[in-house]
Design a protein with these regions (language model features):
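Intrinsic low-complexity/disordered segments
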Residues: 2, 21-22
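Acidic, metal/ion-coordinating pockets
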Residues: 23-204
Length: 204
């Protein structure tokens, strides 16, 4: 297996893309993955969507996303019609009808373990998972229990395999951690590093 540990991808102005290409040998088949920074569909972006449509947001990057084997975004908002905001400073929400546009743009995976997919509470979080799945997008860093939320996601092409981990290390404002309820992965970095090491050892 080929493994890549991605610690942080930081977006400044605009979006920064990280491209990974995993190859058995230079002349053999490759697995290419694009990673983006935050994808937020609220605030000023919501106004742009109202004016030009959600598809317009991805026009310039859709060819790239569709040219690789997988595209992983950091989804920086819940996708839900639920309006049950947590008591926190910044609250975001995306409309469910926009989820399909993400898939049509070539997005295949969405990292959910961050400080904003929880903005509309646990119901909004579970909605997000369902809307992603129904649009053909694989959630990463989410599960029906705390242990399930930290399970890695496999991306495979032929004999090439890449495993994705997604965990949030930031303190989550007014979010209640419940071990046996739907949630996002909140595994400390040192534990995550140890798990990756063990996984690599068990899957050489």
């Amino acid at each position: 297996m080929n493994f890549y540990q991605i610690s942080r991808i930081t977006a400044g102005i605009g979006i920064i893309f990280l491209m990974l290409a995993a190859c058995q040998q230079p002349s053999e088949e490759c697995l290419s993955i694009a990673f983006t920074g935050d994808v937020l569909l609220d605030r000023g972006v919501r106004q742009q969507i109202r004016r030009k449509g959600v598809e317009h947001l991805f026009e310039s990057v859709t060819p790239l996303f569709r040219s690789v084997d997988a595209t992983v975004i950091n989804l920086e908002c819940p996708i839900t019609s639920v309006r049950s905001p947590l008591h926190k400073k910044y609250i975001f929400r995306a409309e469910p009808i926009w989820a399909t546009a993400l898939s049509q743009a070539g997005i295949t995976h969405a990292a959910m373990a961050n400080n904003h997919t929880i903005d509309q509470g646990r119901n909004g979080l579970t909605d997000t998972n369902q809307y992603l799945l129904s649009s053909g997008i694989t959630p990463v860093g989410y599960g029906d229990t705390s242990s399930q939320s930290c399970r890695p996601v496999l991306i495979k092409k032929g004999k090439i395999e890449v495993v994705l981990y997604n965990s949030v290390a930031l303190p989550l404002e007014n979010w209640v951690y419940l071990e046996n309820s739907p949630g996002i992965c909140q595994q400390p970095i040192e534990e995550l590093k140890e798990e990756i090491t063990n996984f690599k050892r068990q899957n050489p």
